[in-house]
């Protein structure tokens, strides 16, 4: 799909599905001669453990695999983090060149100010992959996920941030992961939010 050169949207699945997608994005970018590529990762969790439960391909290891052979740590940016493993905090201490925007930053500074940080970081990039874990959204708005964390973004914030990214940065591929209908409420609120995000994504592409 990426070899077509068209925007690609993938739906998971837990966050481990992003590992091969990032690698395909890296290979495609290299074949196209794109020099500057990056990843924007929206999530409650950093997913940058080397191993998790003795497993290196876990959903908690997605970005560790990515910085091994797709991008450098400085080409990775997070938004929405508010739950960490000790190993992940140690990684961030060792690699301050990455951009980390916490969920509290969005609450304190506003989503637009936080978007501006992403825009400043990636405005000169050739291609960016955007991965969106639905648990970045507070479980009041998106309870249907495997590892919900209180204190996340609102549904409006995630929609506006998605539109800003797709409308202004060179997003070449995207995924939405960790939506779990069996864990959702009877009104399917999480699935409806994921569907609304998809609507907004393709609305941006059509402009």
Label every PLM stretch briefly.
Residues 1-207:
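Conserved alpha-helical scaffold segments that buttress catalytic/binding sites
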């Amino acid at each position: 799909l990426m070899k077509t050169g068209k925007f690609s949207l993938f739906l998971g699945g837990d966050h481990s599905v992003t590992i091969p997608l990032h690698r395909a994005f890296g290979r495609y970018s290299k074949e196209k001669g794109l020099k500057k590529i990056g990843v924007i990762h929206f999530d409650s969790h950093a997913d940058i453990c080397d191993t998790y439960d003795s497993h290196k391909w876990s959903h908690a290891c997605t970005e560790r695999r990515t910085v091994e052979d797709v991008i450098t740590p400085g080409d990775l940016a997070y938004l929405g983090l508010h739950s960490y493993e000790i190993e992940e905090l140690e990684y961030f201490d060792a690699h301050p060149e990455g951009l980390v925007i916490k969920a509290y930053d969005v609450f304190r500074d506003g989503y637009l100010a936080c978007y501006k940080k992403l825009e400043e970081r990636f405005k000169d990039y050739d291609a960016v992959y955007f991965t969106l874990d639905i648990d970045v959204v507070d479980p009041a708005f998106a309870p249907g996920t495997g590892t919900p964390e209180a204190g996340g973004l609102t549904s409006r914030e995630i929609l506006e941030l998605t539109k800003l990214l797709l409308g202004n940065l060179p997003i070449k591929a995207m995924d939405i992961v960790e939506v779990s209908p069996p864990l959702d409420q009877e009104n399917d609120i999480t699935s409806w939010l994921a569907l609304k995000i998809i609507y907004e994504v393709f609305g941006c592409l059509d402009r």
